[in-house]
From Swiss-Prot:
Source organism phylogeny: Bacteria, Bacillati, Cyanobacteriota, Cyanophyceae, Acaryochloridales
Primary location: cytoplasm
Entry-linked HAMAP family: DNA_HJ_migration_RuvA
Subunit structure: Homotetramer. Forms an RuvA(8)-RuvB(12)-Holliday junction (HJ) complex. HJ DNA is sandwiched between 2 RuvA tetramers; dsDNA enters through RuvA and exits via RuvB. An RuvB hexamer assembles on each DNA strand where it exits the tetramer. Each RuvB hexamer is contacted by two RuvA subunits (via domain III) on 2 adjacent RuvB subunits; this complex drives branch migration. In the full resolvosome a probable DNA-RuvA(4)-RuvB(12)-RuvC(2) complex forms which resolves the HJ.
Cellular localization per UniProt: Cytoplasm
Protein name (database record): Holliday junction branch migration complex subunit RuvA
SUPFAM superfamilies, A to Z: Nucleic acid-binding proteins, RuvA domain 2-like
């Protein structure tokens, strides 16, 4: 029904269970959109006009409008909620935990450990998501122009150690994923190099960009 809405953000709402809502005023009408906390941070209340992609969910007892930063993010959300046992809130939780290309990569590679970091996503659900979406997303990400994992990224063993260390230092999964991707694109370190060397570069990037 609605592909996107264009208007001004006039307010935020935070609810229990990691639920976040954004109030978007369009031609004098305020729309309440359920969004990720990341999108909430991206669009603070201010007079500039923004465009948010939407999905309208109609149930017997309610109508809910979901908001997304891009058409690709909305498309992945719709694919996720078609998986048995994955509802809209869990899909938003997955989108909030990892940047879109990283989330797609985790699904395609069957990395259930990374998927299980999203609040509410257990190991069995993560396995089901990977099993049902792996093939479709492998082709879809190429259509969307997402790059696959770079050979410059750390090996899985090194990455796991880095993620655990950076999580302990207080960084979020989304920040860690962005840092490792950025470092992997510029570093001369081998992918199986000493984790401490990767850690130094990752922290340097995070200090400059967060």
């Amino acid at each position: 029904m609605f592909v996107y809405l264009r208007g001004t953000v006039v307010g935020h709402q935070s609810e229990g269970g990691h639920r976040c809502a954004l109030i978007l005023e369009v031609n004098g009408v305020g729309y309440r959109l359920l969004v990720t906390s990341h999108l909430l941070q991206q669009y603070p209340p201010r007079p500039e006009v923004v465009q948010i992609f939407t999905h309208l969910s109609i149930r017997e007892d309610q109508m809910l409008l979901y908001g997304f930063a891009s058409a690709a993010e909305r498309d992945l959300f719709l694919r996720l909620i078609r998986v048995n046992g994955v509802g809209p809130q869990m899909a938003l939780s997955l989108l909030d935990t990892l940047p879109l290309p990283e989330l797609v990569q985790a699904i395609v590679s069957g990395n259930t450990r990374r998927l299980s970091r999203a609040p509410g996503v257990g190991h069995k659900t993560a396995e089901r998501i990977a099993l049902e979406l792996k093939a479709a997303l492998s082709a879809w990400r190429q259509e969307m122009g997402f790059t696959t994992a770079s050979s410059g990224l750390p090996s899985e063993a090194v990455r796991e150690e880095l993620e655990l260390t950076l999580l302990a230092l207080g960084y979020s999964d989304r920040e860690i994923a962005a840092a490792l991707t950025a470092v992997g694109q510029t570093t001369t370190l081998p992918n199986n190099s000493d984790p401490e060397a990767w850690l130094r570069e990752a922290i340097a990037w995070l200090s400059a960009n967060t």
